[in-house]
């Protein structure tokens, strides 16, 4: 797929996400004019972009959606859930066309059925509302040459009276323009140069954005008596009607099929493409958005990954250089410190470039929750908080599916039917909240619902039934540990398998994915009140600071962020046959690194070093032979048969090409 097509698909996907979310706002508040304007503008842009790229079937589908939205905007059709279903069906068809273009470069799917389904709703409109003819919100679709023109629809009477030159009302018919924003802009520019433009309906900004039906209205003042001939020479318009305001005699109509010179059209198309994409995507004129667009630059993902790879190599080289210099020539250490500062700044910059706001993946979730709620006859209010919180692009991509699993779980298992909620003294409408917040170098993402919560007794019985735990084990198990069983593979409390969940897949995948990203996930539930799933994730990946420890002559790395204290080996006690140490009256299980990794220890009890891990990670103390220092390293996660090995998370390359294993203390 070439660069232009790739940019087209990317922009189209953004429009679809924007359209879905604005439609959800409109469905919940049919009187929301701002949402309706955004919806109509976006649908129009999609239609024009598809047409400009030659995807006529997709353009026709977007046109059908636009026509239906226009009838709603004019008040000819009421906004109902059933009609919104038809619009969403059209949006899904548009999204499928974009997917096909991305995969094959063309659209081969038959969208006729979807178009007919959308246009069938238009048949409900009296008159010719179902014919598919688009009219503007300003009634621009009706010709202005009927001898009864009211120019005060466009400008006030005082402005007309104050004009020094004769005033004319011009109805511009743009025909079936494929790029209304660009074409309207050219007509408006010509009118502004030729006449004194007193007003326009809709506004000039709206015309530049293509927010009109078949045409628009202009009121101008000019001493010229050749207004019709001047207007007929305007590029891009299909037809025009000129009427002298305050005079019963109409100026002659411009030639009814006047078209600008073809070569001029081609040039204008080429010149206007960038302007249209800039104005339509932002929802206001390109001039208004100039500063913002300059400050926000799209970076090609491949280039970003290449830059990130170079930084990794630079960091690795820095590590090798420092180790070599410390051993041979200390006079260059000052220069090395300067290199440290430079590479650290470069590293921070690249990491910041890789950060992407949560809204990039959250945008598709409101529609998901809405559709699932409709399928299950549930009333759900979906709330998003903190969608401007940023995460590394790789992490954000990886957690998209886990978040979807959690939301599906909240709809299916969490929120009750409206009648059940009412019987339990709750509002008929349930609430699911997706929130994100930054906590130093981590991001906390929560999915909360105010549903039924987890039934601990049911969970215990299911654990026994599936052979996960024995009856004796679950009887002594705290409720927190019982809740944690939801992450066990194949575990589900649903007796009935649904299309949404209940197959026992997904929750274990959520934990596996988050763990692989060096994060954690937990669940907290109160029966009758609701459930909260919390994912704790690092903001960035790859380059981390580690503590180097030695055991049996081998060197290992422990992420510094997991370390709470380093000390000499303390006295060891035995509790139920397990070795433990005591710190501040708290008992910590002892993990001897040599035993855990099956390498020979060079120390005995009472010797060596002790690394106590943060309680938030795991309440444990790790024994090793020696602590060698700390350093930032490039961590490469294990893949293939090495992935998933308890206690190991990846490897790092040090000076002289030495490879050090990075430990996963949570599973050690």
UniProtKB/Swiss-Prot annotation:
Domain CheW-like per the UniProt entry, residue ranges: 543-668
Region feature (Disordered): 123-149, 243-291
Domain (Histidine kinase): residue spans on this chain: 330-541
Catalysed conversion reaction: ATP + protein L-histidine = ADP + protein N-phospho-L-histidine
GO terms classed as biological process: chemotaxis
Low complexity composition-biased segments: 133-146, 271-286
Gene Ontology MF terms: ATP binding; phosphorelay sensor kinase activity
Residues carrying Phosphohistidine: 44
Biased composition annotated in UniProt, kind: Acidic residues: 256-270
Residues annotated as domain HPt: 1-101
Free-text disruption phenotype from the record: Deletion leads to the loss of both chemotactic and phototactic responses.
Post-translation changes: Autophosphorylated.
Signal peptide: none
Pfam families: CheW, H-kinase_dim, HATPase_c, Hpt, P2
UniProt enzyme class: transferase
GO CC terms: cytoplasm
Entries under PROSITE patterns matching the protein: CHEW, HIS_KIN, HPT
EC number(s) stated in the UniProt entry for this protein: 2.7.13.3
Keyword ATP-binding applies: yes
Keywords: ATP-binding, Chemotaxis, Kinase, Nucleotide-binding, Phosphoprotein, Transferase, Two-component regulatory system
Entries under InterPro entries matching the protein: Bact_Chemotaxis_CheA, CheA-like_dim, CheA-like_homodim_sf, CheA-like_P2_sf, CheA_P2-bd, CheA_signal_transducer, CheW-like_dom_sf, CheW-lke_dom
Role played: Involved in the transmission of sensory signals from the chemoreceptors and photoreceptors to the flagellar motors. Autophosphorylates, probably in response to a chemo- or phototactic signal, and transfers its phosphate group to CheY. Could also transfer its phosphate group to CheB.
Subunit organization: Interacts with CheW1, CheY, and several transducer proteins (HTR-I, HTR-II, BasT, CosT, MpcT, Htr4, Htr6, HtrVIII, Htr16 and Htr17).
Name this protein carries in UniProt: Chemotaxis protein CheA
Native organism: Halobacterium salinarum (strain ATCC 29341 / DSM 671 / R1)
Gene name of the record: cheA
